[in-house]
Amino acid sequence: MIESILSGSVRYRWLVLFLTAVVAVIGAWQLNLLPIDVTPDITNKQVQINSVVPTMSPVEVEKRVTYPIETAIAGLNGVESTRSMSRNGFSQVTVIFKESANLYFMRQQVSERLAQARPNLPENVEPQMGPVSTGLGEVFHYSVEYQYPDGTGASIKDGEPGWQSDGSFLTERGERLDDRVSRLAYLRTVQDWIIRPQLRTTPGVADVDSLGGYVKQFVVEPDTGKMAAYGVSYADLARALEDTNLSVGANFIRRSGESYLVRADARIKSADEISRAVIAQRQNVPITVGQVARVKIGGELRSGAASRNGNETVVGSALMLVGANSRTVAQAVGDKLEQISKTLPPGVVIVPTLNRSQLVIATIETVAKNLIEGALLVVAILFALLGNWRAATIAALVIPLSLLVSAIGMNQFHISGNLMSLGALDFGLIIDGAVIIVENSLRRLAERQHREGRLLTLDERLQEVVQSSREMVRPTVYGQLVIFMVFLPCLTFQGVEGKMFSPMVITLMLALASAFVLSLTFVPAMVAVMLRKKVAETEVRVIVATKESYRPWLEHAVARPMPFIGAGIATVAVATVAFTFVGREFMPTLDELNLNLSSVRIPSTSIDQSVAIDLPLERAVLSLPEVQTVYSKAGTASLAADPMPPNASDNYIILKPKSEWPEGVTTKEQVIERIREKTAPMVGNNYDVTQPIEMRFNELIGGVRSDVAVKVYGENLDELAATAQRIAAVLKKTPGATDVRVPLTSGFPTFDIVFDRAAIARYGLTVKEVADTISTAMAGRPAGQIFDGDRRFDIVIRLPGEQRENLDVLGALPVMLPLSEGQARASVPLRQLVQFRFTQGLNEVSRDNGKRRVYVEANVGGRDLGSFVDDAAARIAKEVKLPPGMYIEWGGQFQNLQAATKRLAIIVPLCFILIAATLYMAIGSAALTATVLTAVPLALAGGVFALLLRGIPFSISAAVGFIAVSGVAVLNGLVLISAIRKRLDDGMAPDAAVIEGAMERVRPVLMTALVASLGFVPMAIATGTGAEVQKPLATVVIGGLVTATVLTLFVLPALCGIVLKRRTAGRPEAQAALEA
């Protein structure tokens, strides 16, 4: 069939070229539609279930909210694991599904299970699923702030919207904001009701998260003394507000043949109307809200805050829908924010702080630069070694054509163009088959012209092209098949490594398949069309000189093979020993151009105190000349996609381009050290320096933010915490450990209110009445809403902040007694019904698959991940004795490394088996198959030496490089063996066949090795964004091809000579024995 394809491609060459052009146009269109991202999205399929329970402790949340939800989810088909976190007033259950699951269907299933679980949950608890987004979802951050944060520098015009001469801020609706809370509440209102609704309509945006400021509320602050004097309870106050603030419909009336809709609208529209609401009557005199309480515009008791460059702001985050194009979505969000900025109230601005498209563009620029430079190097080698620009052009055209055809397949397989899928393309590797056919066609045409002594006729030329293509079709087909086969097992990668490398492998296989088809169709057709004139009879000087130098060594290797074979064995032995000195890591860290400084304080730190710590930290870091801006997110945002306690902050450090860094500062590590120096004097913080995407990936995949985590499982939280502290002490002594920390699970100060049930009964009250009074005064009680157009704001009854924190005021809080006939309503102070106690409680309870756990996390610097964990595990086993029933597991990036290493132990042998099977099909001789397979270990040896020389650890990226170089080495060996066998078929003696076959294949072997290795050179030496991820793969391929080429040209002929001589000695009719 293949020979028919070759003949047809030459016969109908113009049709083939026309169809190729059509496919190229379609490919160009598909390439333009290709989604672009930084890296493949390695986040597992998961759903986050968030529940807000403001009045519960962590243990209560675990028992009454988290556990029932976990129980409801258990047994759901497709669930792989669960993990949960219970904090003060908040629960999050993360459900992780199998990769084969349909996320939208699973969300529906989770929703049904939650509906079944609601009867088992406390009243008013409404579990909510997080947005349909991933670890790469936060594509755009922006800050909503005042153009002049404190009014300094603003143009002041009293009475007009903006800053006023008295220091207040006048809104466009006439509200005067004269305190910090109201001004921050106004910024949050702009974010929630102007920016967010418009931004959510942007294509590809799943949702928009808001953090910082205060959600605006109309706060009713009771005067407890006046309430007691008037005999008004908190329940009376709430009921009055609810009864006053309503709207009803009363159908319609007919009048003069027309229908009139009847409306009874008594909704409250302002704070003044709240103050005038009547609560009750005393001696026929109405008592209003304003007589017993102060009404003001305030904010919620917030759980999160944000700031930028030392000033409090509101930060918004655009979350990308799963599967969307991050570059397109981020650019669309930026464009939309520019439009929204024109509609903002005077004095308020939007400041973009993090734009993912900038990182995407920088990364793709690196990839494109490497691909273009690699392609140019490949073309240059083709021109130099072929000595015919037409032939070189034919081979070079396969490069863009294979890329365009691959783009069609990438879209069909939903693979984005990113650092891994496009960055690993080596056009030299891809066009090896085309190069072999072009080189052989060029050689045969030159020989035929020389024999005929004239230019060939059309029929002669076409006949020669078909014959030359047929001659090389066997090594080409099987050679390409070998390269294809070595990548096939990589598709069995699972988990994170599967998500990271499967797109790369599929893209490579698409490119190889495209180039293979083109080499059988387009290349013969182009050779027939373009190589019409006289073809040079001599080879280029470089090849001639190389052959002259090579022949004596080749003859020596065939005559005396053992020294050459011994050198090959020694090389492999040395490489095996050297590999033990190569470090290990899961993946090289992508330089995201920015940094993230995670700050954790003692558990009792309030959200306001966290902000007070963040503001000077931002100013200190901002003083570094290489830093462009610093913004912080403390606590939990509205969607709780990344929930943190009030004592934790994420400080995003946006760096300037490296060209603007000060002299002497050239690396990220230096910047991190300078940041540590700035933050060192700030006591009370525990820092962890990572990068934004890296941090989110680590957290979403493994539940931790750092490189390494030691997870300690057990039941007793006190024992878990104590064991974790001992493990942390060991980790801190382990070389390479940085940012070691243990989340503080206990030590959260608790103010307990203990009910005196006997006293409550004596006063004729119930526990619920007392509890409701406490809850309303402390936490606040919603009492309706005020509508302002589309906006709606809660009316909340709550004590003023200073009174909520004053024990004397709380003790005197009046609890209204039941009404007695004929008597004024009396009250009793709260202190006579309860007792106050200060204790310490739990800060957080974390669980994995229903098992409680505490983790110790650390980053690794100055050494590779694998050796660090080996060292730390040995120290922990020696120095830390685990209590009965307790065990530990390693998590974070090391967990991914472990899983990938186990998978590689299966993949690598499978690759060798597939290579051997393919070779045997091509050669038909077990001995010669084994001979060609010796190319693999020497190719691997070169990769090991290259890693060691460059100080690059072994990673999954390097492993893929080892697999790739094995295929190229085998391809070159197959090309050489095919030439040797051809001469044996012609009746040559074994030694002569080996020598002449090897001499004939010097040029194709050198060409395939050079184009494959030089295509990777730009990746190996690149310094742009994302280059660090490509370097291990490129380094291994280049180093491996150096040793593999030496093997092919020296050791392989030496081995082949021995094998052929023995076969000849065993069978006089050697020729027949060596046939396929």
Swiss-Prot record:
Record flagged with keyword Cell membrane: yes
Subcellular location field: Cell inner membrane
Superkingdom of the source species: Bacteria
Key word Transmembrane helix present: yes
Example GO molecular function: xenobiotic transmembrane transporter activity
Ranges annotated as spanning the membrane: 14-34, 366-386, 390-410, 418-438, 475-495, 502-522, 561-581, 903-923, 928-948, 959-979, 1003-1023, 1035-1055
Upregulation: By nickel.
Alphabetized UniProt keyword annotations: Cell inner membrane, Cell membrane, Cobalt, Membrane, Nickel, Plasmid, Transmembrane, Transmembrane helix, Transport
GO CC terms in record: plasma membrane
Topology of this chain in the membrane: Multi-pass membrane protein
Known role: The products of the genes cnrA, cnrB, and cnrC are likely to form a membrane-bound protein complex catalyzing an energy-dependent efflux of Ni(2+) and Co(2+). The mechanism of action of the CnrCBA complex may be that of a proton/cation antiporter.
Family in the record: Belongs to the resistance-nodulation-cell division (RND) (TC 2.A.6) family.
PANTHER family per record: CATION EFFLUX SYSTEM (ACRB_ACRD_ACRF FAMILY) (PTHR32063:SF24), PTHR32063
Protein name in the entry: Nickel and cobalt resistance protein CnrA
Species this protein is from: Cupriavidus metallidurans (strain ATCC 43123 / DSM 2839 / NBRC 102507 / CH34) (Ralstonia metallidurans)
